[in-house]
Amino acid sequence: MSNAKHSPDLLFEVSWEVCNKVGGIHTVISTKAQTVTRKFADRYVLLGPDLSHEGVNPEFEEDPNLLKAWRQSLYNEGIRVRVGRWKIKGEPTVVLVDFSSLIPRKDEILKSLWESYHVDSISGQWDYIEPVLFGWAAGVVIASYVETFGTPTEKAVAHFHEWMTAAGGLYLRKHAPYIATVFTTHATVMGRCIAGNRLPLYNDLPKFNADELARQFNVTAKHSIEKMAAAYHDAFLTVSDITANECKYLLGREPDGVTPNGFENDFVWAGEEYYAKRDEARRAMISVAEACLGEKFTGDPLIVGTSGRYEFRNKGIDVFIESLKQLAASDRLRREVLAYITVPAGNRGPRLDLQAHLADPSKPIDAGQYRHSTHYLENATWDPIVNALKNSNLTDPGSKVKVIFVPTRSEERR
């Protein structure tokens, strides 16, 4: 095998989190976009899901005149796309793909994945089918783009992140094999399930039967497409050595390489701007907490926080809250602590009473609302964070450790 390095002439990157912040992959892609765009310019194209039915997308700026003829040709084939720029540094070209036209064809597409790759979709529910249709549509769009704008001598590479986009790479392997495919998993489906169910993931990794456990945890479809993606993409990558070992045993293929996540040097502000932003953020966070809790901080609180996907155990939210409880119980604690938990959770929007009070402090706070949340929670009774805080010293009036839960957006966007 040749070790020669080749740079693609056309580079596509596909993720459910392009212009759609859900978790860390959004950060991974958005913070490298400036560097990639500097190298490839408009030969670098990002693809994400068109979720315009959920409201205006604040991260996307559409350009109705960009690639107009090509968009029309795709529309004639039954796929609608919007083309524009991602409003981040580098302003990369983005194609948002409306995959709704594929819904009537879902059985045909799932059948094709089974016949070509033995992807077992039979138990997959909508949270599986929806991203599979998006991934498939993204594959169709990439093939059309290369056919329209590429030349026979140009090298095209399509990079797919996570199982949610894997159908795109599998589509290209069959229908446009001249486009090289790369699949990156940031965390395996089964790894999340095993750890989330309190099984010793890393101690017993070689002993697990991933396919059998997938059936037990009812994630056969997601595990199956991830496993086949690892097997059938031209290159298989992951982001850490520990996840690479996970892939070896749970997906049956060792990754071809490990690409650690990186950030631009200007990922955070510097100098005076940093301190100004920091002070502004502190004031806002303290004001929101005081309004929610109906208590004033007596000094200068230490602000800590945790964020990420709402995986109570895997993301260490349980450990974070337990640590706060122990801190609150310590007689050595002298300084007040304000803890923010910002994770996506089902909600009906920000509290109106809180917004009104922050705009006009004479407006009262609704005493009937859950005081540790900034939003109206959908299922507060069953919420793990709410239940972990319930009847603990973290909810005691006058506790030196105060907790605010910010359900940043609905989990429905995955």
Identify the function of each model-found stretch:
Residues 1-414:
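Catalytic cores of nucleotide-sugar-dependent glycosyltransferases that transfer UDP/GDP/TDP-activated
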